[in-house]
Design a protein with these regions (language model features):
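A cross-family phosphate/adenosyl-ligand binding-site feature
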Residues: 1-119, 123-192
Length: 192
């Protein structure tokens, strides 16, 4: 049986994180299932230098967000987990409150009920109290909230490097091993 990862892409800004996850997963043996929301499709065209068809080609299987009867809607369909990148506040709220109105939220609900990793990359700033409460709710339910904040201690060379490192860290929460440099501690020139 193949090892499967589900990628959900919602209408929040930051489509490059979902695209980069798909690109990184192409270098692995995982079977990748993509669910792209209608608003996500608009934002892919708006903010990324990709056509929706190009993004879809990065996945092994593409599911219609309205098809709540797709394989990923059932716990009997085994996956290694799910990453929602980017995750809109609407999607986060729906997951937090058990509202499974589309295939992304239903697949997330399945991940939680089956105790599979669910990683959410929320894209909003600043967070309001409702956002934070919803993040706490999904965390209490077993999800991992992973805002795409870049790290600087490894000396990223450019924005693309920051996106890759951040996305690779998110995928590592699903136990996906992708090739990026690991932190090796402070160099002797930076030690106190």
């Amino acid at each position: 049986m193949p090892q499967r990862i589900v990628i959900g892409m919602t209408g929040a800004t930051g489509q490059i994180y979902g695209i980069r996850a798909l690109q990184l997963l192409r270098e692995t043996e995982y079977e990748v299932h993509l669910i792209l929301s209608d608003a996500g499709k608009i934002n892919v065209s708006q903010e990324a230098d990709y056509e929706v068809s190009e993004v879809s080609e990065l996945a092994d299987v593409v599911h219609d967000v309205k098809n709540i009867g797709a394989e990923t809607a059932s716990g009997s369909f085994r996956t290694e987990g799910m990453l929602i990148a980017p995750c809109s506040m609407k999607t986060l709220s729906n997951i937090a409150h058990g509202s499974s109105g589309d295939l992304i939220t239903r697949s997330a609900d399945v991940a939680l009920k089956e105790r599979r990793p669910l990683v959410l990359m929320p894209r909003e700033k600043p967070f309001n109290r409702i956002h934070l409460k919803n993040m706490l709710e999904v965390t209490d339910a077993g999800a991992i909230v992973f805002p795409p904040f870049p790290s600087f201690y490894q000396g990223p060379t450019d924005l693309d490097d920051m996106i890759t490192r951040t996305t690779a860290r998110a995928l590592s929460q699903l136990s996906v091993d992708v090739e990026v440099d690991e932190w090796e501690g402070l160099s002797s020139s930076h030690s106190p």
